[in-house]
Amino acid sequence: MKFFSAYKTCIKIAVDQAIAYRFDFIVSMIITFLGSLGLPLVALLIYGAGAGFPGWSFYEVLLIQSLFTVSQAFTRVCLGDMVWTTMFHVREGSFEVVLLKPMNPLAYIIATTFSPGCFGNLLCGFVLLTYALWHIQIASFSAVFACLLLFIAGIAVMVSIYLIIAAASFKWVGNSRLPEIASSVEAFGQYPIEIFPVAIRAIASFIIPVCLIGFYPAAALLGRTGIEAFGSAGVALLFLAFGVCLYRKMIRMYQGAGG
């Protein structure tokens, strides 16, 4: 209950700040909205040139990429600054301030990293998703349920990646390349899995299940998933548990500015 109370308060503060500096917020919304259009524009150019991904129409690929954008943006809104906040405190030797707070350090970091600046990405994702859904045939009602289940699992994967990258910053202090690693890993979830070699498919499904971020939810909505998608969702729960445990372990290894 303490976490939810703190998170609610932090959301209110973040929203109040966005309202107070509304011009900056609006500009940020526009920039992030336009930035999220880059990926579908690339797909549009590919299909416009007469090429494409075998077995997938443009609107089906757009469905994958829009679900990927929504999942990524939602996670970034809720805790997107967790990696940078952790990196900052570790680099400056001020993580003791977090440890002195009367709540779990991980819960505190999550509660204080709500980021309205990513609302533009989220809005763009929903616009693209609506446009894609208008042009495709949903397989069935059960397909919608399966899509939602796999979508939630995809968010769990996103959270796990952020936790692991943030945990790594305790070891590799001040390494600004860590967030880039996260983005590179996530990118495998925004394309049809069939375009990758078998080894990459296995890794992206059952080791670091990034296919859940965009591909598997879209495939479920189209009625193209098998049992492997739900097996991947089970792996996502284990991946999340690993991320939480790793972050907590790295906190215990933190030595502070004088370490």
Can you name each region flagged by the protein language model?
Residues 1-137, 141-259:
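Hydrophobic transmembrane alpha-helices and immediately adjacent juxtamembrane helices
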